[in-house]
């Protein structure tokens, strides 16, 4: 079997080796070490951040690496099966209706991929490998066995970055959070009696729900598959229990005994018929039908499946032991124990003895607890689709077994693979969980792959989800981030996996804890699920301990069950968090001083980092958190060296390394490619020829990374002060230097595609010969009619010339005769060239041509397809949105000349002015601390160890932070960063500039001077470096204006929105405003000739062109629509003229309107449809 697209080589992905390779990342040439303020040493590294995707897919297809890992963990005695093997085993054998013939499928295997990832993107096809299975047909009558290898279809493969290529675009399959199969006990309060009533649901992975409940009359009832309720003893009797057996098992319960007395059935047959009547009302019941209905509902594996996770949950909840682990259907013992649990819960008991003798707690379940919610990861989601496809195929196989001749049947003649490939294709193309990958920057892609969604098939819907399911739960700790979730209708339904979390075999999220024994920390790390964690006492990572790991504090604050906080002795602690950042996601862990930010703003900060566009020059933040390197490393956008060796060759697009073992590794860099979001994907080398490189070292940066660290923005010198009202309400004032030096400049690439098709009137043609177009317009087109690379284009310019045959009018017999004698005249064609869309400019950086003549695979009816890539360099400008990492966002309100900006005592002008009002009420104080530490990192500091005033400071800081040079990078990890006292102390010890002056005092403030007058401002101002991101909300993509354009077919009013080239809506309230000002003529103009007076607007255009006065408006179309609406309600409404005669409002002026348009040579409606559609 060929290893395809499983996880990357193990040294990059696995635990301890990963930790080693992370250490080597510090040795990147030119990569400075971050000075960390962390006090806590983490016992383990952050695990592979893409493992949730890669491991799940590796399980599905059973890669050799995955099998080796499983064998290592489970031992050789346990058989390891992949997800595809499981599903084929579950399906096989498929038997015909008589049981004489059977077909078994096994041994799925993959052949080599047909295309590389780049070829798939280029040709708009799927990145997939052919899947084959061994099909074995057995004729039980003749004992004949026929075995064949059958091609099932092309199976989409995961790239080593955890994505899929579907139809040439990169997609991500998001993990789904669903309620786990199992048994759930619930309590509700009866409104009339105010007594607690209890119920239980047995929820399978597939099949009928079984619900028991106690009602206010104290009878125990059952509902099968949400049908009508009946006494529970009817079900027990239908299962073959006698009254004596029921009394023996449930005699302790009065409510069960009273239910038994009043159930109205005396034996098994009556009970079965009673159940059948309730389940299938209106049908004539028989004993056999009733028996098979009950068996099919709960005891047949084809119809009822608890799944491994469901069996595990049932056994765990009811204390049933592991004897029935392989059984995926319900047993009578399951049902009886569930009932016993329910009646004891209703009676108020707190414990019970299970059938295996185990004492188990009796309590209701919290459905929002992460012990009761599990993840369907990518492998399981695809497996479910394969199951759907195979079950559809199974029906076809059965039918063919009965219709074909038994002698001539072969496995290939029975199998129709279309349903399987259709189910897989449908999932990747249309499922809510298969999403267009967010490639805005490296972080957004990484976060997308780690996303957890409660939406989708089998999950919740936005409308039905209440507050409880969206809320943060104590069991999310270390599993799902409490901060990172969208604002808006999906809040709380979409989350992000926490930094250290992993998913176990059952789909439950586990988080690591460090074992504590008798108050002493050990090196043992245990991964616990949420319900396992409830049994232990867990302390925070910042517990004080000595060098031997013994906890020194007299008492420790801990978490116990349900997230309650207690203070206990060190000996009572079972576990310790492995890291302070364990509870938050990757994006949240990249917010410095997170502990000083309000949660709402931190949420915005985490989300806005994903919207940052990669800049032309990336710069690592002065103030980081230590997560930047791990995030960039695992995001998959860096080029990482596989083997130690020496760099042999470096260019902009290729790096060659001669490895120590004599092999040569070549790495190809991706240059100026377009991402899904239109940002620029570019990789740049970090090494030089002759450099020694180790395995795991970064060779090249990707977009938005710098020296192997995630670098989404730039460090700018910021001053917190109001300035002439220009930064009122979160507006931002920028220095012109930022524009001139391309500090916040980004490159955006747009793709334009056109195809030449066969039409009814003949084929379209890509050509330079375009009718009625001057040579000046064609200057940048080559001889084929395609724009040259390097051409500067703007809106309206032709990118690809194309002509489409025009429909010819019916010829008279005389004309036909003349045509036959003198031959064809030049065919009539019209210009349908591809032009640069409105509002876009840029430089052509790439052209791809696909043609049927070159054997390219094109859609039916398409002869040629051209793709043109236009790149645009966007400098920062008024109206662009900027943000920090703390949810502090704003729009550029003014760009000031450098000489007008406030400047520091040494003459340095600040880069950006933020308003102070943006801080206090939003409670994101982290940004202020970031500014102070940013200044320190840029200026450097040196602590005078002899000065007694620094004694406290020296105690808290490690030695490598005593003397730090200017321009250093610092790390302040979340919940374990620099304290206020440390920052204040360091500000008092910051290094002076070259003139020997300290610019910023110990309060973090400086005296600023007004750039216009040179006078100092009256108060000191907080100044320092803040990391600023440029977000994707760019004014270039939002600004829009329309003169003429398309109109709605019904109302004849202009369309709305930039995409439709629409107009501005002049709504009801705007009309009131015009009325209030008495602007009658302006209002009339807005409601008629500028909107839906069809004839009037053409006449106005004509008047403007000819320089005449504007004519009077006519009747708007919407008035005619209103009349027709009233007439359709049988109300005879007429319009009377001034003299009382009825007026005709039909389109009598249409001819005049057409003539006016034709005479002016205009098409006022600017029909935006593609010309191919018209043809």
UniProtKB/Swiss-Prot annotation:
> Which sequence ranges are marked TM in the entry?
none
Protein name according to UniProt: DNA-directed RNA polymerase subunit beta
**PROSITE patterns xref list:** RNA_POL_BETA (PS01166)
Q: Which organism is it from?
A: Corynebacterium diphtheriae (strain ATCC 700971 / NCTC 13129 / Biotype gravis)
This enzyme catalyses: RNA(n) + a ribonucleoside 5'-triphosphate = RNA(n+1) + diphosphate
- Encoding gene, per UniProt annotation: rpoB
User: Which residue intervals make up region (Disordered)?
Assistant: 1142-1175
Subunit details for this protein? The RNAP catalytic core consists of 2 alpha, 1 beta, 1 beta' and 1 omega subunit. When a sigma factor is associated with the core the holoenzyme is formed, which can initiate transcription.
**GO BP, sorted A to Z:** DNA-templated transcription
């Amino acid at each position: 079997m060929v290893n395809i697209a499983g996880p990357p080589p193990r040294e990059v992905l696995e635990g301890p080796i990963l930790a080693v390779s992370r250490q080597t990342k510090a040795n990147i040439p030119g990569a400075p070490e971050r000075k960390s303020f962390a006090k806590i040493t983490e016992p383990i590294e952050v695990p592979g951040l893409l493992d949730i995707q890669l491991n799940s897919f590796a399980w599905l297809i059973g890669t050799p690496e995955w099998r080796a890992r499983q064998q290592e963990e489970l031992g050789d005695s346990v058989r390891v099966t992949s997800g595809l093997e499981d599903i084929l085993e579950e399906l096989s054998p498929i038997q015909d209706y008589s049981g004489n013939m059977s077909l078994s499928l096994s041994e799925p295997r993959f052949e080599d991929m047909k295309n590389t990832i780049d070829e798939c993107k280029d040709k708009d096809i799927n990145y997939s490998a052919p899947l084959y299975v061994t099909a074995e047909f057995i004729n039980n009558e003749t004992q004949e066995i026929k075995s064949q290898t059958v091609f099932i279809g092309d199976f989409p493969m995961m790239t080593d970055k955890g994505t899929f290529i579907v139809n040439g675009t990169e997609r991500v399959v998001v993990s789904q959070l669903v309620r786990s199969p199992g048994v759930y006990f619930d309590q509700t309060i009866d409104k009339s009696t105010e007594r607690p009533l209890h119920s239980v649901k047995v929820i399978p992975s597939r099949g009928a729900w079984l619900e028991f409940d106690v009602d206010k009359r104290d009878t125990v009832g059952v509902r099968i598959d949400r049908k009508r309720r009946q006494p529970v003893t009817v079900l027990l009797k239908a299962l073959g229990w006698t009254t004596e057996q029921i009394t023996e098992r449930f005699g302790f319960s009065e409510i069960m005994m009273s239910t038994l007395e009043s159930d109205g059935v005396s034996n098994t047959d009556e009970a079965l018929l009673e159940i059948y009547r309730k389940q299938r009302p209106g049908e004539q019941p028989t004993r056999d039908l009733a028996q098979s209905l009950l068996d099919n509902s709960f005891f047949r594996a084809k119809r009822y499946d608890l799944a491994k996770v469901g069996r595990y949950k049932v056994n765990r909840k009811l204390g049933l032991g592991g004897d029935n682990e392989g059984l995926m259907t319900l047993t009578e013992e399951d049902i009886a124990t569930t009932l016993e649990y329910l009646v004891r819960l209703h009676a108020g008991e707190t414990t019970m003895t299970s059938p295996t003798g185990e004492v188990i707690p009796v309590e209701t379940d919290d459905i929002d607890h992460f012990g009761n919610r599990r993840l369907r990861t990518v492998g399981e989601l695809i497996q479910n689709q394969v199951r759907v496809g195979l079950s559809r195929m199974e029906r076809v196989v059965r039918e063919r077994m009965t219709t074909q001749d038994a002698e001539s049947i072969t496995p290939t003649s029975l199998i129709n693979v279309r349903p399987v490939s259709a189910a897989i294709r449908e999932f990747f193309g249309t499922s809510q969980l298969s999403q267009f990958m967010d490639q805005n920057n490296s972080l957004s892609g990484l976060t997308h792959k780690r996303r957890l969604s409660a939406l989708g098939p089998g999950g919740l819907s936005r409308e039905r989800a209440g507050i409880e399911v969206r809320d943060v739960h104590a069991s999310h700790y270390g599993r799902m981030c409490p901060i990172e979730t969208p604002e808006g209708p999906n809040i709380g339904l979409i989350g992000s996996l926490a930094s250290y979390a992993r998913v176990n075999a059952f789909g439950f999220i586990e988080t690591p804890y460090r074992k504590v024994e008798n108050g002493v920390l050990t090196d043992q790390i245990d991964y616990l699920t949420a319900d396992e964690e409830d049994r232990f006492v867990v302390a925070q990572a910042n517990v004080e301990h000595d060098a031997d790991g013994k906890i020194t504090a007299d008492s420790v604050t801990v978490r116990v069950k349900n997230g309650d906080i207690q203070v206990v002795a060190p000996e009572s602690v079972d576990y310790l968090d492995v890291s302070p950042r364990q509870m938050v996601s990757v994006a949240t862990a990249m917010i410095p001083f997170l502990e000083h930010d309000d949660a709402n703003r931190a949420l915005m900060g985490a989300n806005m980092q994903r919207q940052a566009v990669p800049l032309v020059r990336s710069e690592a933040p002065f103030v980081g958190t230590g997560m930047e390197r791990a995030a960039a490393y695992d995001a998959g956008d860096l080029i990482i060296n596989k083997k130690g060796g020496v760099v042999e060759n470096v260019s902009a697009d290729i790096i060659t390394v001669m490895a120590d073992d004599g092999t040569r590794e070549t790495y190809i860099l991706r240059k100026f490619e377009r991402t899904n979001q239109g940002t620029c994907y570019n990789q740049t080398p970090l090494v030089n020829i002759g450099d020694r490189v180790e395995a795991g070292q970064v060779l090249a940066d990707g977009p938005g990374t710098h020296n192997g660290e995630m670098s989404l923005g730039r460090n700018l010198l910021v001053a917190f002060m109001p300035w002439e009202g220009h930064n009122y309400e979160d507006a931002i004032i920028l220095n012109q230097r930022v524009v001139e030096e391309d500090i916040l400049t980004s490159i955006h690439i747009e793709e334009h595609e056109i195809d030449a098709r066969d039409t009814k009137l003949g084929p379209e043609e890509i050509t330079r010969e375009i009718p009625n177009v001057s040579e000046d317009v064609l200057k940048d087109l080559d001889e084929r009619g395609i724009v040259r690379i390097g051409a500067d284009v703007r809106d309206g310019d032709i990118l690809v010339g194309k002509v489409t045959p025009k429909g010819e009018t019916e010829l008279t017999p005389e004309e036909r005769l003349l045509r036959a004698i003198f031959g064809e005249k030049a065919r009539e064609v019209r210009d349908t060239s591809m032009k640069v869309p409105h509002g876009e400019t840029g430089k052509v950086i790439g052209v791809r041509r696909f043609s049927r003549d070159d054997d390219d695979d094109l859609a039916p009816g398409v002869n040629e397809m051209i793709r043109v890539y236009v790149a645009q360099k966007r400098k920062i400008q008024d109206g662009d949105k900027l943000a920090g990492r703390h949810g502090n966002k704003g729009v550029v309100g003014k760009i000031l000349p450098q000489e007008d900006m406030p400047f520091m005592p040494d003459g340095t002008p600040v880069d950006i002015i933020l308003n102070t009002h943006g801080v206090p009420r939003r409670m994101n104080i982290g940004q202020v601390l970031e500014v102070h530490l940013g200044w320190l990192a840029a200026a450097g500091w040196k602590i005078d160890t002899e000065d007694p005033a620094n004694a406290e400071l020296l105690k808290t800081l490690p030695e490598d932070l005593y003397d730090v040079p200017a321009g250093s990078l610092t790390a302040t990890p979340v919940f374990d960063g620099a304290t206020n006292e440390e920052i204040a102390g360091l500000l008092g010890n910051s290094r002076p500039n070259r003139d020997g002056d300290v610019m910023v005092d110990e309060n973090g403030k400086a005296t600023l001077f007004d750039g216009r007058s040179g006078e100092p401002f009256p108060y000191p101002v907080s100044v320092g470096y803040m990391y600023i991101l440029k977000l994707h909300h760019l004014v270039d993509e939002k600004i829009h204006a329309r003169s003429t354009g398309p109109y709605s077919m019904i109302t004849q009013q202009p369309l709305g929105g930039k995409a439709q080239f629409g107009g501005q809506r002049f709504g009801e309230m705007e009309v009131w405003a015009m009325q209030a000002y008495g602007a009658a003529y302006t209002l009339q103009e807005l409601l008629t000739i500028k909107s839906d007076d069809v004839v009037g607007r053409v006449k106005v255009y004509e008047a403007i062109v000819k320089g005449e006065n504007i004519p009077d408006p006519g009747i708007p179309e919407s008035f005619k629509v209103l009349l027709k609406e009233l007439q359709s309600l049988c109300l005879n409404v007429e319009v009377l003229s001034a003299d009382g005669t009825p007026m005709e409002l039909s389109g009598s002026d249409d001819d005049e309107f057409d003539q006016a348009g034709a005479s002016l040579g205009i098409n006022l409606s600017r029909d935006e449809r593609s010309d191919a559609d018209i043809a």
